[in-house]
Amino acid sequence: MITTTALVPARRSAVRTLLATVTEHDGVSPLDEAALLALDGEDARHLLLTADGAATDTHAAEATAGSAASADPADPADPAAPADPADPADETLLGYVSVLGDGTVQGMVDPAHRRRGHGSALLRAALALRPDAGVWVHGALEGSLAFLTDAGLTETRRLLTLRRDLGGAQPLPSAPAPTLEGLRLDTFEESRDAEAWVAVNVRAFADHPEQGALTRADLEQRLAQPWFDAEDMLVALRDETLVGFVWIKREQPGATDRDAEIYVVATDPSVQGHRVAGHLMATVLERLERDGVPGVELYVEADNAPALRLYENWGFEVSGRDVQLRATERG
Protein backbone atom coordinates (compact mmCIF):
# COMPACT_ATOMS: atom_id res chain seq x y z
CA MET A 1 0.00 0.00 0.00
CA ILE A 2 1.44 3.36 -1.03
CA THR A 3 1.34 6.19 1.50
CA THR A 4 2.06 9.94 1.70
CA THR A 5 0.88 12.98 3.60
CA ALA A 6 1.43 15.24 0.59
CA LEU A 7 -0.47 14.72 -2.65
CA VAL A 8 1.36 15.50 -5.86
CA PRO A 9 -0.44 17.93 -8.20
CA ALA A 10 -1.89 15.32 -10.56
CA ARG A 11 -3.45 13.31 -7.72
CA ARG A 12 -4.72 16.44 -6.01
CA SER A 13 -6.39 17.44 -9.26
CA ALA A 14 -7.82 13.94 -9.68
CA VAL A 15 -9.35 14.07 -6.20
CA ARG A 16 -11.00 17.40 -6.97
CA THR A 17 -12.32 16.08 -10.29
CA LEU A 18 -13.77 13.02 -8.56
CA LEU A 19 -15.24 15.28 -5.87
CA ALA A 20 -17.10 17.31 -8.49
CA THR A 21 -18.47 14.13 -10.09
CA VAL A 22 -19.64 12.65 -6.78
CA THR A 23 -21.13 15.95 -5.56
CA GLU A 24 -23.15 16.36 -8.73
CA HIS A 25 -24.40 12.76 -8.54
CA ASP A 26 -25.22 12.66 -4.82
CA GLY A 27 -26.35 16.25 -4.38
CA VAL A 28 -23.97 16.85 -1.47
CA SER A 29 -20.20 17.12 -1.11
CA PRO A 30 -18.63 14.05 0.55
CA LEU A 31 -15.76 16.18 1.89
CA ASP A 32 -16.04 19.03 4.37
CA GLU A 33 -13.88 22.13 4.56
CA ALA A 34 -11.22 20.51 6.75
CA ALA A 35 -10.74 17.67 4.28
CA LEU A 36 -10.56 20.12 1.37
CA LEU A 37 -7.94 22.24 3.10
CA ALA A 38 -5.96 19.08 3.89
CA LEU A 39 -5.56 18.37 0.16
CA ASP A 40 -2.96 21.14 0.09
CA GLY A 41 -1.32 20.33 3.42
CA GLU A 42 0.69 17.58 5.06
CA ASP A 43 -1.42 16.84 8.13
CA ALA A 44 -3.62 14.09 6.70
CA ARG A 45 -3.36 10.70 5.07
CA HIS A 46 -4.87 10.25 1.65
CA LEU A 47 -6.17 6.84 0.59
CA LEU A 48 -6.70 6.44 -3.13
CA LEU A 49 -8.22 3.65 -5.18
CA THR A 50 -7.02 3.60 -8.77
CA ALA A 51 -8.23 1.69 -11.79
CA ASP A 52 -5.66 -1.07 -11.21
CA GLY A 53 -7.79 -2.10 -8.24
CA ALA A 54 -5.22 -1.34 -5.53
CA ALA A 55 -6.24 0.79 -2.58
CA THR A 56 -3.48 3.35 -2.30
CA ASP A 57 -2.55 4.84 1.06
CA THR A 58 -0.24 7.55 -0.22
CA HIS A 59 2.22 7.67 2.72
CA ALA A 60 5.02 5.24 1.78
CA ALA A 61 7.26 5.07 -1.27
CA GLU A 62 5.81 4.02 -4.64
CA ALA A 63 8.19 1.05 -4.62
CA THR A 64 6.33 -0.54 -1.69
CA ALA A 65 3.13 -1.03 -3.67
CA GLY A 66 3.85 -4.69 -4.36
CA SER A 67 4.14 -5.51 -0.65
CA ALA A 68 1.03 -3.66 0.46
CA ALA A 69 -0.61 -6.65 2.10
CA SER A 70 2.26 -7.26 4.49
CA ALA A 71 3.61 -3.74 5.00
CA ASP A 72 2.86 -1.84 8.18
CA PRO A 73 1.43 1.66 7.57
CA ALA A 74 3.98 4.39 8.05
CA ASP A 75 3.78 6.63 11.08
CA PRO A 76 2.15 9.93 9.95
CA ALA A 77 4.29 11.79 12.48
CA ASP A 78 7.53 10.26 11.17
CA PRO A 79 9.55 13.06 9.51
CA ALA A 80 11.27 10.44 7.36
CA ALA A 81 7.98 9.34 5.80
CA PRO A 82 8.38 10.20 2.10
CA ALA A 83 6.07 12.37 0.10
CA ASP A 84 4.33 10.98 -2.98
CA PRO A 85 7.29 10.66 -5.39
CA ALA A 86 5.39 10.33 -8.65
CA ASP A 87 3.08 12.52 -10.68
CA PRO A 88 0.77 9.85 -12.12
CA ALA A 89 -1.17 11.91 -14.63
CA ASP A 90 -2.39 8.77 -16.40
CA GLU A 91 -4.07 7.19 -13.34
CA THR A 92 -7.84 6.82 -13.16
CA LEU A 93 -9.06 7.55 -9.65
CA LEU A 94 -12.05 5.43 -8.57
CA GLY A 95 -12.20 6.28 -4.88
CA TYR A 96 -10.64 8.46 -2.20
CA VAL A 97 -10.63 8.68 1.59
CA SER A 98 -9.23 11.46 3.77
CA VAL A 99 -7.93 10.54 7.23
CA LEU A 100 -7.35 13.77 9.15
CA GLY A 101 -5.01 14.10 12.08
CA ASP A 102 -7.90 14.19 14.56
CA GLY A 103 -9.17 10.82 13.29
CA THR A 104 -11.94 12.26 11.15
CA VAL A 105 -12.57 10.12 8.06
CA GLN A 106 -14.59 10.98 4.96
CA GLY A 107 -14.47 9.69 1.44
CA MET A 108 -16.11 8.84 -1.86
CA VAL A 109 -16.31 6.30 -4.68
CA ASP A 110 -16.98 7.16 -8.31
CA PRO A 111 -20.72 6.53 -8.91
CA ALA A 112 -19.87 4.49 -12.02
CA HIS A 113 -17.76 2.08 -9.95
CA ARG A 114 -19.88 1.53 -6.84
CA ARG A 115 -21.06 -1.83 -5.47
CA ARG A 116 -17.79 -3.49 -6.46
CA GLY A 117 -16.14 -3.63 -3.05
CA HIS A 118 -14.15 -0.42 -3.48
CA GLY A 119 -15.81 1.33 -0.56
CA SER A 120 -15.20 -1.66 1.69
CA ALA A 121 -11.52 -1.75 0.74
CA LEU A 122 -11.09 1.94 1.49
CA LEU A 123 -12.98 1.66 4.78
CA ARG A 124 -10.85 -1.28 5.93
CA ALA A 125 -7.69 0.66 5.09
CA ALA A 126 -8.90 3.76 6.94
CA LEU A 127 -9.87 1.80 10.06
CA ALA A 128 -6.52 0.00 9.99
CA LEU A 129 -4.86 3.41 10.24
CA ARG A 130 -7.34 4.81 12.78
CA PRO A 131 -9.47 2.21 14.58
CA ASP A 132 -10.99 5.13 16.52
CA ALA A 133 -11.99 6.94 13.33
CA GLY A 134 -15.11 9.07 13.22
CA VAL A 135 -16.52 8.48 9.73
CA TRP A 136 -18.69 11.26 8.31
CA VAL A 137 -21.66 10.75 6.00
CA HIS A 138 -22.41 14.23 4.70
CA GLY A 139 -26.05 14.64 3.81
CA ALA A 140 -26.92 11.51 5.83
CA LEU A 141 -27.23 9.59 2.56
CA GLU A 142 -29.29 6.46 3.12
CA GLY A 143 -27.04 4.18 1.08
CA SER A 144 -23.87 5.35 2.81
CA LEU A 145 -25.41 4.99 6.26
CA ALA A 146 -26.58 1.46 5.44
CA PHE A 147 -23.11 0.56 4.13
CA LEU A 148 -21.37 1.74 7.30
CA THR A 149 -23.97 0.22 9.62
CA ASP A 150 -23.57 -3.14 7.87
CA ALA A 151 -19.81 -2.77 8.40
CA GLY A 152 -20.36 -2.55 12.16
CA LEU A 153 -20.27 1.21 12.70
CA THR A 154 -22.83 3.05 14.81
CA GLU A 155 -23.96 6.67 14.87
CA THR A 156 -22.23 8.77 17.52
CA ARG A 157 -22.84 12.31 16.35
CA ARG A 158 -25.26 14.31 14.20
CA LEU A 159 -24.70 17.78 12.77
CA LEU A 160 -27.64 19.80 11.48
CA THR A 161 -27.69 22.43 8.76
CA LEU A 162 -30.19 25.20 9.51
CA ARG A 163 -31.39 27.74 6.98
CA ARG A 164 -33.70 30.73 6.82
CA ASP A 165 -34.81 33.00 4.00
CA LEU A 166 -33.96 36.67 4.10
CA GLY A 167 -36.29 39.35 2.84
CA GLY A 168 -39.69 40.80 3.62
CA ALA A 169 -41.56 37.49 3.54
CA GLN A 170 -39.86 36.43 6.79
CA PRO A 171 -39.04 39.48 8.89
CA LEU A 172 -36.05 39.28 11.18
CA PRO A 173 -36.91 39.19 14.89
CA SER A 174 -35.77 42.11 16.98
CA ALA A 175 -32.84 41.33 19.27
CA PRO A 176 -32.65 42.78 22.79
CA ALA A 177 -29.78 45.21 23.26
CA PRO A 178 -26.63 43.81 24.89
CA THR A 179 -26.24 44.50 28.59
CA LEU A 180 -22.49 45.15 28.62
CA GLU A 181 -21.20 48.68 28.99
CA GLY A 182 -18.40 49.76 26.70
CA LEU A 183 -19.30 47.24 23.99
CA ARG A 184 -18.75 48.03 20.34
CA LEU A 185 -18.55 46.08 17.09
CA ASP A 186 -15.68 46.46 14.68
CA THR A 187 -14.25 44.78 11.59
CA PHE A 188 -11.67 42.08 12.34
CA GLU A 189 -8.06 43.26 12.10
CA GLU A 190 -5.60 40.38 12.04
CA SER A 191 -2.70 42.23 13.68
CA ARG A 192 -4.93 43.39 16.52
CA ASP A 193 -7.41 40.56 16.93
CA ALA A 194 -5.97 37.22 15.79
CA GLU A 195 -4.48 36.02 19.07
CA ALA A 196 -7.50 37.10 21.10
CA TRP A 197 -9.84 35.55 18.51
CA VAL A 198 -8.15 32.16 18.86
CA ALA A 199 -8.23 32.37 22.66
CA VAL A 200 -11.94 33.23 22.78
CA ASN A 201 -12.69 30.54 20.21
CA VAL A 202 -10.93 27.90 22.32
CA ARG A 203 -12.84 28.91 25.44
CA ALA A 204 -16.20 29.20 23.69
CA PHE A 205 -15.87 25.81 21.99
CA ALA A 206 -14.08 23.90 24.73
CA ASP A 207 -16.40 20.93 24.20
CA HIS A 208 -16.40 21.02 20.40
CA PRO A 209 -13.95 18.52 18.83
CA GLU A 210 -13.12 20.52 15.71
CA GLN A 211 -13.88 24.20 16.30
CA GLY A 212 -12.34 24.22 19.76
CA ALA A 213 -9.07 22.82 18.41
CA LEU A 214 -8.54 25.67 15.93
CA THR A 215 -5.04 27.15 16.14
CA ARG A 216 -3.53 30.43 14.97
CA ALA A 217 -2.17 28.58 11.92
CA ASP A 218 -5.66 27.20 11.19
CA LEU A 219 -7.09 30.71 11.41
CA GLU A 220 -4.44 32.08 9.07
CA GLN A 221 -5.13 29.29 6.60
CA ARG A 222 -8.79 30.29 6.49
CA LEU A 223 -8.00 33.99 6.26
CA ALA A 224 -5.98 33.17 3.14
CA GLN A 225 -8.91 31.46 1.36
CA PRO A 226 -10.36 33.19 -1.72
CA TRP A 227 -13.75 33.56 -0.09
CA PHE A 228 -12.47 35.51 2.93
CA ASP A 229 -13.64 39.11 3.18
CA ALA A 230 -12.63 41.09 6.25
CA GLU A 231 -15.86 43.08 6.03
CA ASP A 232 -17.76 39.87 6.79
CA MET A 233 -15.90 39.21 10.05
CA LEU A 234 -17.02 41.28 13.02
CA VAL A 235 -15.60 41.31 16.52
CA ALA A 236 -17.27 42.50 19.71
CA LEU A 237 -14.89 44.60 21.81
CA ARG A 238 -15.49 45.56 25.41
CA ASP A 239 -13.09 48.31 26.42
CA GLU A 240 -10.91 47.08 23.50
CA THR A 241 -10.91 43.47 24.77
CA LEU A 242 -12.31 40.96 22.30
CA VAL A 243 -15.29 39.17 23.86
CA GLY A 244 -17.11 37.79 20.83
CA PHE A 245 -17.17 37.48 17.07
CA VAL A 246 -19.25 36.48 14.09
CA TRP A 247 -17.88 35.38 10.74
CA ILE A 248 -19.82 35.27 7.48
CA LYS A 249 -18.73 33.04 4.63
CA ARG A 250 -19.70 33.78 1.05
CA GLU A 251 -18.24 31.45 -1.58
CA GLN A 252 -17.87 34.48 -3.83
CA PRO A 253 -16.85 37.58 -1.83
CA GLY A 254 -19.36 40.36 -2.30
CA ALA A 255 -21.89 38.13 -4.05
CA THR A 256 -25.50 38.99 -3.25
CA ASP A 257 -27.34 36.37 -5.33
CA ARG A 258 -26.31 33.32 -3.30
CA ASP A 259 -26.90 32.15 0.24
CA ALA A 260 -24.33 33.08 2.86
CA GLU A 261 -23.19 31.01 5.82
CA ILE A 262 -22.85 31.99 9.45
CA TYR A 263 -19.40 30.43 9.52
CA VAL A 264 -18.99 30.81 13.26
CA VAL A 265 -20.46 32.94 16.02
CA ALA A 266 -19.25 32.86 19.61
CA THR A 267 -18.83 34.83 22.79
CA ASP A 268 -16.36 34.46 25.60
CA PRO A 269 -17.88 32.44 28.48
CA SER A 270 -17.26 35.42 30.77
CA VAL A 271 -19.87 37.50 28.94
CA GLN A 272 -22.44 34.85 28.10
CA GLY A 273 -25.90 35.89 29.16
CA HIS A 274 -25.27 39.51 28.21
CA ARG A 275 -26.90 39.21 24.75
CA VAL A 276 -23.65 39.73 22.87
CA ALA A 277 -24.24 36.78 20.53
CA GLY A 278 -27.74 38.01 19.71
CA HIS A 279 -26.37 41.47 18.96
CA LEU A 280 -23.77 39.98 16.61
CA MET A 281 -26.35 37.78 14.87
CA ALA A 282 -28.81 40.62 14.42
CA THR A 283 -26.13 42.86 12.97
CA VAL A 284 -24.94 40.41 10.31
CA LEU A 285 -28.44 39.20 9.39
CA GLU A 286 -29.59 42.78 8.87
CA ARG A 287 -26.49 43.47 6.79
CA LEU A 288 -27.02 40.39 4.61
CA GLU A 289 -30.67 41.29 4.14
CA ARG A 290 -29.75 44.82 3.07
CA ASP A 291 -27.27 43.32 0.61
CA GLY A 292 -30.09 41.31 -0.97
CA VAL A 293 -28.69 37.90 0.01
CA PRO A 294 -31.58 35.42 -0.44
CA GLY A 295 -30.87 33.18 2.53
CA VAL A 296 -28.42 32.21 5.24
CA GLU A 297 -27.41 28.89 6.75
CA LEU A 298 -25.43 27.65 9.72
CA TYR A 299 -24.41 24.40 11.38
CA VAL A 300 -25.23 23.18 14.88
CA GLU A 301 -24.86 19.95 16.82
CA ALA A 302 -28.15 18.05 16.96
CA ASP A 303 -27.88 17.56 20.73
CA ASN A 304 -27.32 21.28 21.44
CA ALA A 305 -30.88 22.01 22.52
CA PRO A 306 -30.28 25.60 23.74
CA ALA A 307 -28.66 26.62 20.44
CA LEU A 308 -31.41 24.94 18.44
CA ARG A 309 -34.08 26.86 20.36
CA LEU A 310 -32.19 30.11 19.81
CA TYR A 311 -31.87 29.57 16.07
CA GLU A 312 -35.47 28.43 15.73
CA ASN A 313 -36.51 31.69 17.38
CA TRP A 314 -34.48 33.44 14.69
CA GLY A 315 -36.51 31.67 12.02
CA PHE A 316 -34.03 28.94 11.08
CA GLU A 317 -35.26 25.49 10.03
CA VAL A 318 -33.41 22.21 9.52
CA SER A 319 -32.31 21.85 5.90
CA GLY A 320 -29.67 19.13 6.07
CA ARG A 321 -27.94 16.53 8.24
CA ASP A 322 -24.45 15.08 8.54
CA VAL A 323 -23.90 11.91 10.55
CA GLN A 324 -20.69 10.60 12.11
CA LEU A 325 -20.26 6.91 12.88
CA ARG A 326 -17.62 4.91 14.72
CA ALA A 327 -16.69 1.26 14.87
CA THR A 328 -18.41 -0.58 17.70
CA GLU A 329 -15.98 -1.51 20.45
CA ARG A 330 -15.64 -5.22 20.92
CA GLY A 331 -15.34 -6.56 24.42
From Swiss-Prot:
Residues 183-331 form the N-acetyltransferase domain. 1D-myo-inositol 2-(L-cysteinylamino)-2-deoxy-alpha-D-glucopyranoside binds at residues 33, 210, 249, 261, 299. Acetyl-CoA 1 binds at residues 115-120. GO terms for molecular function: mycothiol synthase activity; protein-N-terminal-alanine acetyltransferase activity. Its EC number is 2.3.1.189. GO terms for biological process: mycothiol biosynthetic process. SUPFAM superfamilies: Acyl-CoA N-acyltransferases (Nat) (SSF55729). Residues 59-89 are annotated as: Disordered. It is an enzyme of class 2 (transferase). Catalyzes the transfer of acetyl from acetyl-CoA to desacetylmycothiol (Cys-GlcN-Ins) to form mycothiol. This is Mycothiol acetyltransferase. The lineage of its organism: Bacteria, Bacillati, Actinomycetota, Actinomycetes, Micrococcales.
